[in-house]
Amino acid sequence: MFIRATKIRILSEIYYLRSCLINNLKPNFVILLESPQKWSDYELIDSGDFEKLERFGNYCLVRPEPKALWEKRLSEKEWLAIAHTKFTTGAGFGKSGKEDSGTWHQLKKMPDQWVIGYKKGQLDFNMRLGLTAFKHVGIFPEQAPNWDYIYENTFRISAENGKNGFARPKILNLFAYTGAASLAAKCADGDVTHLDSVKQVVSWARTNMELSKQDNIRWVIEDALKFVKREARRGNLYQGIIMDPPAYGHGPDGEKWKLDELLFEMMQEVAQILAPKDSYLVLNLYSNGYSALLSETIVKSAFHLMDKKRESYELTYGELYLTDKFEKALPLSVFTRLKR
């Protein structure tokens, strides 16, 4: 019986792979490893000893990195000779919600804010960076493969909509931060809604839109789960949904977000507002302990994909990472992408 069942499974996989080839779909049981390629304005120079040395445009920064468990290749003296500024953690380090708080120590003259660009073919946008009190600078460079995916799929759907006389595809970016993913969709002629619960962050995203010579992004300052539930009640659909939820957060009216408790509920609501055809979803997760396989299972369960023929959708999942100049790979987040 085991041999017969194995043969049936192998034949099933062969049939599935054949269907993927015919329908130009990627098989959904391969874990992908993706990293930014040929980005002139960003470089991970070295990593190790729980730190990373990065170049953003003309300026080099040292930041804490809990996943850099190995040794640095360059000496501490060499790091400090290269860096313009270094972030050191403060009293909140290790405390929930305050683990990234600390202070920047300037080593060379540099501005508090500066601009870098991202360009890959027709995908071209600018981002204003700044030194925040929580070690972040306004961009997560490892996300570049997600931006490429968002651009390519928004462009594909936009072209198909135009061919059929339909409106531009509606794209929803949840937990949207400073808007790199929103700009990727906008560059592909998406009708973009950008949602974040922090007013100052949305203002920052608007600046990035203007720096990129784009316009007409819809800005929403609201709790993400509340917004999605309302859209579901109204029957509104989107052809692209992007999610990069934090481990913890607060809505503008004090709503509490905890990833472990609310992610699956959020995904169930998102499943109701993603268009059933010619659509895509990108879920990205940074929280420690979350694997690519876990994110894939969450999406598969929320969208009831176990009940659907695999050739009717494409589900891919994997890790995003950065590679330093010494070929050390630094894994930073996991993702799942659904295309149908």
Predicted regions and their residues:
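Non-catalytic substrate-recognition/targeting regions of SAM-dependent transferases
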Residues: 40-54, 61-141, 148
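Conserved alpha-helix/loop element of class I SAM-dependent methyltransferases that forms part
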Residues: 141-159
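Conserved class I S-adenosyl-L-methionine
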Residues: 168-174
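Conserved SAM-binding loop of SAM-dependent methyltransferases across substrates and taxa
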Residues: 178-190
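Conserved SAM-binding motif I beta-strand of class I
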Residues: 191-196
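S-adenosyl-L-methionine
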Residues: 200-240
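S-adenosylmethionine
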Residues: 224-302
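C-terminal catalytic and target-recognition region of SAM-dependent MTase-like enzymes
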Residues: 280-340
